[in-house]
Amino acid sequence: MENRMQIFQNEEFGRVRIFVTEDGVPWFVGKDVADNLGYQNGSRDINRHVAPEDRTKGMVFDGNQRKETILVNESGLYSLILSSKLESAKRFKHWVTGEVLPSIRRHGAYMTDAL
């Protein structure tokens, strides 16, 4: 199964990388989500808040090398959002659910007016 990596950027939240499978299922790089939601220890907090069936490990190229990282599905993303203590988590959820995911479902990619 081939996955396409997409990077989307938000002025407030920064970068979040996702992999979209051939059948259109998005998997979010857990560290990106955890960092944007204010978690202090990404791997530990992902394992604590995301059910095993909602996370997997995958290889991600970080610019220098390929590294194994935790990926979370949409359900895992919501678990991290709902467990975050940051006020901005609600805005992050609205951005992802109102803009990013609908765009992926419509176009197979995250599209903005700038693209």
What are these model-derived regions, one by one?
Residues M1-L115:
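An anion-engaging/catalytic patch
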